[in-house]
Amino acid sequence: MARALSRPFPFHCASASKDLLRVAPGHHITRPDYDVARLIDVVTRFRAKWNKRVYLEPGEAIALGAGVLVTSVLDVLHNDMDLAILDTSATAHMPDVLEMPYRPVIIDAADAGAKPHTYRLGGMTCLAGDVIGDYSFERPLAIGDKLVFLDMAHYTMVKTTTFNGVRLPSIATHDPATGKITVHRRFGYRDYRDRLS
């Protein structure tokens, strides 16, 4: 973003009555390696040159690295390769996997082939493309195994869908001091129905 704002800017295309420029959705401005000093300098110079207020939309930056999505293996089968069907869905619960593409990290998993057992992880919907990706594990997956996807908070309430009536994931917090998990919201049929009306 800093590079974009420091280039010549075709502001003459904007309405003269506008005094606000909104930028940065999707920029990871909270990452430790993000050049915040440069961004501040560029925004300060931009404001002075164009006499515009600049609003930095934090987007997913406020939740970067936060939250997990805990899933269970529903079925394991083989069709040219080992497959594991999960009780989650790329299309319903993590659409950036299909749109970006975005590859979420799974605890104790690695890229395909890096560990002894590689699986293509699929979602639970009927969509042929509901595929999360290929991951490898130290041991074979079994029905009921839990897989924990990291950095998933930015999906929890914003981009999820109830495609084909798939239930949204429950929202819970974990207290590391006590190990207690508190469920704050469980979604059900009423939530699906109310999205349609």
Q: Predicted segment positions?
A:
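Charged (often Lys/Glu-rich) extended helix/loop segments that serve as interaction or gating elements
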Residues: 42, 53-197
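Active-site loop/helix belt of alpha/beta enzymes
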Residues: 1-77, 164
